[in-house]
């Protein structure tokens, strides 16, 4: 996959991924709407949960590969064309904020036990701490590019021209920025995936199906560009 087309290739992947995603969301909606008499078996519920998590993981694995090859196009992944304008209003390091999962859990499940609530509360604190770590590292990368020598060289571009060594310094700074942004993106995506997985581990299969249904619907809302043409 050439550097110049990594984001384009990922956009094509997302189009196919969304087709499969709609199918999974329909399955989750159906499973969560059945009463106890008609509900699918526990094994079928567990299988559906596992399949959906694997499906979501595939998205982030493909994204990781694309970001790793993106080169200059890494910046595209922070305001991606496969997200609609609604999604871009709430982007956090290129996707949804991991702690949003806890809000979605609250609105999806009304029968959490006290033990489950305590575990989720502990996980929420851990997730928010890790979110701060991601943002701290991201800020340090941005700060390194804003250092006076680099900014001076950047201002000379297209103006009076750069003196000896400044062009190399600027190129090196941009490489550091791109690598740092890619690392921040990957760390954020890992936190997104692990947070969903850990929440699901706390829930029963019927509860997990309800939460994943809501998360799946959010994925559609963020990524379905057809909404903008509706």
From Swiss-Prot:
GO terms for biological process: abscisic acid-activated signaling pathway; DNA-templated transcription; negative regulation of abscisic acid-activated signaling pathway; negative regulation of cellular hyperosmotic salinity response; response to abscisic acid; response to salt stress. Residues 7-230 form the DOG1 domain. GO terms for molecular function: sequence-specific DNA binding. Keywords: Abscisic acid signaling pathway, Activator, Stress response, Transcription, Transcription regulation. The keyword Transcription regulation applies. Negative regulator of salt (NaCl) tolerance probably by enhancing abscisic acid (ABA) sensitivity. Loss of function contributes to the increased salt (NaCl) tolerance of cv. Sha. This is Protein RESPONSE TO ABA AND SALT 1. It comes from Arabidopsis thaliana (Mouse-ear cress).
